[in-house]
């Protein structure tokens, strides 16, 4: 395990300043109204990140396998009163964002979210599986941190490690720890330390 100091966690949101014409940012309410009205009912798949519509990336077989392994590992660890969600929207009002992370540990049962999406107060952990999306997933840490997501994992398939971001602040996560093959990742849900997950159980 290696520890990264806060000075090494300088992540920032995308800067659209190079675009030569004005951009329009959607509010979260506007985006949700568009979804409800069927604007995105075609083949296009988007989610809202920092007020912008961002196309969702297609998952290859390696990504899909790591996603399933991670879901199985988390499902065998979390306590009663929580559940693991897969590629479902979460709502981050303060960041005008409604991403759909690969995995999310949310409070309560599946049926609790029939008419709403989990918000940061409902969420213990967000996980993104990263291969070609590694740079974007690292930048997205800034949104998760500012929005109040307690812990963010990046399952980094490029370097075969899991990056664990914690201690969120408006400027980003204050802590990052990297876990490598042969190590185990401690799992904390709702402030309670649970058993660890072996990295080898997550990486394909």
PLM segments and residue spans:
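Gly/Pro/Ser/Thr-rich low-complexity, intrinsically disordered segments predominantly at protein N-termini
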Residues: 1-204
């Amino acid at each position: 395990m290696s520890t990264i100091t806060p000075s090494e966690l300088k992540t920032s949101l995308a800067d659209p300043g190079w675009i030569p014409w004005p951009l329009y940012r959607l509010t979260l309410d506007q985006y949700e109204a568009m979804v409800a009205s069927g604007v995105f009912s075609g083949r296009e798949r988007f989610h809202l990140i920092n007020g912008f519509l961002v196309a969702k990336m297609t998952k290859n077989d390696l990504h899909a396998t790591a996603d399933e392994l991670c879901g199985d590992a988390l499902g065998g660890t979390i306590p009663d009163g929580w559940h693991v969600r897969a590629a479902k929207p979460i709502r981050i009002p303060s960041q005008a964002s409604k991403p759909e992370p690969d995995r999310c540990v949310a409070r309560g049962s599946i049926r609790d979210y029939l008419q709403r999406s989990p918000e940061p107060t409902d969420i213990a952990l967000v996980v993104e599986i990263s291969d070609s999306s590694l740079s974007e997933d690292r930048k997205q840490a800034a949104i998760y941190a500012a929005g109040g997501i307690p812990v963010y994992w990046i399952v980094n398939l490029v370097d075969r490690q899991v990056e664990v971001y914690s201690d969120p602040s408006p400027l980003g996560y204050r802590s990052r720890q990297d876990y490598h093959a042969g190590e185990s990742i401690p799992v904390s849900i709702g402030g309670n330390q649970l058993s660890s997950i072996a990295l080898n159980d997550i990486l394909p």
